[in-house]
């Protein structure tokens, strides 16, 4: 996989990709599967705008079960349920109630992409979600830096976490004439994924910044030390 030069990879998209269960008693046919270099990276279930999008989520969760085709989802990084005016995403193994929406914050990127891919008609929520999550550079970036394991649970970033990390990186890369950097504060509510955001940021810094960056984690309570250590482990 060429992470630095996405254009060097080979991309394929299939419709109704058929996968059999291990006992060949059942077959699944995801509506769309995206392959990169022959590896299934994204699986999409599409529904009519008149059908509850939860059906697409339930179908995708079911298809990952041992009685269906878990082998397809061993490699997939992103799963989507789309229905023209709705779109929800997750990663493999995510429970139904944890699927989320993506709100694109880089409007210049979105408008440029819409002009390129959606020309001559009004764009939809489905269009925006696919562009935000499955554009070549974005999909590889999400896979490399923004999917982590919390224990045995695979997690993908929320859009707030992604754009928070990107803003931090932007600030870190900006120096004044004396080579000083500005600090900053990322505001979080309780339970919004602060620790996971820190892990994603650390991963990005260690893999992308030149030299040997050092990361210092400071907590204000002793009980947080163990929690943070376990999260980073």
Where are the regions that the model predicts?
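ATP-dependent helicase/translocase motor core
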Residues: 1-214, 219-233
């Amino acid at each position: 996989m060429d992470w630095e030069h996405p254009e060097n990879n080979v991309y394929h998209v299939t419709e109704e990709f058929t996968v059999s269960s291990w006992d060949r008693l059942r077959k699944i046919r995801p509506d769309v599967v995206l392959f990169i270099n022959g590896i299934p990276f994204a699986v999409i279930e599409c529904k009519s705008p008149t059908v509850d999008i939860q059906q697409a989520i339930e179908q995708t969760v079911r298809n990952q079960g041992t009685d269906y085709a878990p082998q397809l989802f061993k490699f997939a990084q992103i799963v989507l349920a789309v229905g023209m005016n709705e779109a929800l995403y997750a990663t493999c193994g995510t429970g139904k109630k944890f699927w989320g929406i993506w709100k694109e914050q880089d409007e210049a990127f979105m408008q440029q992409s819409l002009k390129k891919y959606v020309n001559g008609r009004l764009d939809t929520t489905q269009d925006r979600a696919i562009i935000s999550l499955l554009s070549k550079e974005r999909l590889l970036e999400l896979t490399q830096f923004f999917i982590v394991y919390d224990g045995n649970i695979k997690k993908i970033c929320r859009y707030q976490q992604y754009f928070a990390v990107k803003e931090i990186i932007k600030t870190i890369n900006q120096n004044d004439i004396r080579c000083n950097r500005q600090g900053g504060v990322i505001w979080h509510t309780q339970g919004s994924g602060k620790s996971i955001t820190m892990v994603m940021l650390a991963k990005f810094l260690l893999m992308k910044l030149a030299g040997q960056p050092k990361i210092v984690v400071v907590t204000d309570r002793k009980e947080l030390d163990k929690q943070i250590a376990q999260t980073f482990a």
